[in-house]
């Protein structure tokens, strides 16, 4: 999976405008414009790299003379002390782009690292780790790319990717069966329907109505096991809601197909990378 450069450039230019505006009152007054410098991206912890091309693109857009030597690629496992890349170009431009570049690569690597940890915890089970739409506005493509770099899979990218009936949709439509029936009459054959359920009665109704994917929202492990047995061969089962690293393995061992974790994108810790 690669991010289109035209998309990256729009996002990066916006990030640069946020930080630099029209002048850097430190670098522009201290550093001669023709002074050249070098720097390194250095891993300060163990983790998974993501966002290197995005970070380097910050400097490319600021400085036509910028050059970089890469020692790692997105998806690589990093150890503390690893040199990720060496940078060279205008000293002033390296300083101007430093914070924006680090914000992006640290955030994306944090997501990839957290995802890789979750994926390791479910090894040997049937479950896949996915993200959600709980992403930061404007950063969804970068965040979902980072999940893939960490070994996870993407859930819906946006509301047009598939139909997901949550409790509010179901209540507004007059129940699970009626909601699925209404959608089936309007959706194309390529669009799957997922239904959020809160108990086994709702699981049974969703199965009978023909849902392809059933989400188990905050259900107990015992209820998950029963839902998996009920759905066998009929629908995929997704577990979601309040799942932590401590509960991840037991949830996976219930036999669910998918475990979606919003925390991978909405509250992940940044990965420590320095630029010196």
Question: What residue spans do the PLM features occupy?
Answer:
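Acidic/glycine-rich phosphate/pyrophosphate-binding loops and surrounding catalytic core
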Residues: 1-198, 202-209, 213, 222-230, ...
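Short secondary-structure boundary segments
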Residues: 218, 241, 263
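Cys/His-rich Zn2+-binding cysteine-cluster or related metal-binding knuckle/ribbon modules and their
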Residues: 245
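Active-site loop ensemble at the mouth of alpha/beta enzyme cores that anchors a bound cofactor
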Residues: 274-276
């Amino acid at each position: 999976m690669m991010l289109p450069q035209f998309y990256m450039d729009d996002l990066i230019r916006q990030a640069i405008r946020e930080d630099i505006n029209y002048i850097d009152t430190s670098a522009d007054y201290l550093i001669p414009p023709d002074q050249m410098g070098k720097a390194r991206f250095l891993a300060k912890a163990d983790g998974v790299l993501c966002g290197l091309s995005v970070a380097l693109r910050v400097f490319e857009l600021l400085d036509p003379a910028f050059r970089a030597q890469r020692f790692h690629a997105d998806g690589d496992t990093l150890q503390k002390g690893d040199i990720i890349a060496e940078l060279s170009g205008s000293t002033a431009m390296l300083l101007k782009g430093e914070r924006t570049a680090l914000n992006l690569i640290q955030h994306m690597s944090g997501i990839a690292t957290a995802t890789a940890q979750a994926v390791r915890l479910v090894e040997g089970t049937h479950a896949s780790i996915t993200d959600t739409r709980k992403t930061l506005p404007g950063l969804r493509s970068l965040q979902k790319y980072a999940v893939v770099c960490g070994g996870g899979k993407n859930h819906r990218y946006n509301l047009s990717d598939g139909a997901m009936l949550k409790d509010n949709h179901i209540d507004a439509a007059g129940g699970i069966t009626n909601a699925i029936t209404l959608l089936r009459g309007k959706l194309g054959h390529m669009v799957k329907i997922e239904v959020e359920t809160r108990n086994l009665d709702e699981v049974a109704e969703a199965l009978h109505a023909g849902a392809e994917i059933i989400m188990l929202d905050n259900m107990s492990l015992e209820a998950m096991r029963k839902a998996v047995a009920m759905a066998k061969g009929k629908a995929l089962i997704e577990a979601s809601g309040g799942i932590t690293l401590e509960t991840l393995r037991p949830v996976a061992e219930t036999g669910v197909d998918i475990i979606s974790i919003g925390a991978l994108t909405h509250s992940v810790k940044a990965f420590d990378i320095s630029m010196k």
